[in-house]
């Protein structure tokens, strides 16, 4: 289930729009997650990963950054990641069309709170079981969600570590892995060439031996 949706400006973390689950029981628990979302917005910058999943106990944050705006959703951990990012892509398309040009100029929090109407309507379509089945089958153009970086929300917030730093670590690991594969390929090539050279030397020596000793 989609429990909380927030949209914020990346440059300064200013909340632009939000929508929270109306259920009272969920509402009592969601304040903590809403505070975490606001803290997260303040840590984002231009170097932050554009797509990220942050685990938060029984819940999971997913966010998407497009054109300087962060679209964030809080879901139950069992909610499919692919649907969560399809939902965020949907919000981005509509929000950018309606308010994209005004985002850099606003200074008041929740300047686009009326966008909640669209959020509510879209959220229902992703929660409905039949709609979810349809979305799962038609949303083939969405990028491979398995490649999206995953981190823990409390570790990010408590350590005070910017998401750009986490992204840098992930990039470094990827670079090291690539270098390891290249080195392994190079060593395999050297080994192959050495074997071929040994065969060539043996062949030449054999020819010389036969020519001078048997002819």
Curated annotation (Swiss-Prot):
PANTHER family documented for this protein: VESICLE-TRAFFICKING PROTEIN SEC22B (PTHR45837)
A Pfam family hit: Longin
InterPro entries, sorted: Longin-like_dom_sf, Longin_dom, Sec22, V_SNARE_CC
Positions in the Lumenal compartment: 214-215
Record's bilayer topology term: Single-pass type IV membrane protein
This protein's record includes keyword Endoplasmic reticulum: yes
Presence of the UniProt keyword Protein transport in the record: yes
One GO cellular component term noted in the UniProt record for this chain: Golgi apparatus
Origin superkingdom: Eukaryota
Residue spans, topological domain Cytoplasmic: 1-190
Similarity annotation: Belongs to the synaptobrevin family.
Function comment: SNARE involved in targeting and fusion of ER-derived transport vesicles with the Golgi complex as well as Golgi-derived retrograde transport vesicles with the ER.
Domain v-SNARE coiled-coil homology stretches: 134-194
PROSITE patterns found in the cross-reference section: LONGIN (PS50859), V_SNARE (PS50892)
Biological process annotations from GO: endoplasmic reticulum to Golgi vesicle-mediated transport; protein transport; retrograde vesicle-mediated transport, Golgi to endoplasmic reticulum
GO molecular function, one term: SNAP receptor activity
Transmembrane segments: 191-213
Protein name: Vesicle-trafficking protein SEC22b
Assembly, per entry: Component of 2 distinct SNARE complexes.
Organism: Xenopus tropicalis
Lineage, highest ranks first: Eukaryota, Metazoa, Chordata, Craniata, Vertebrata
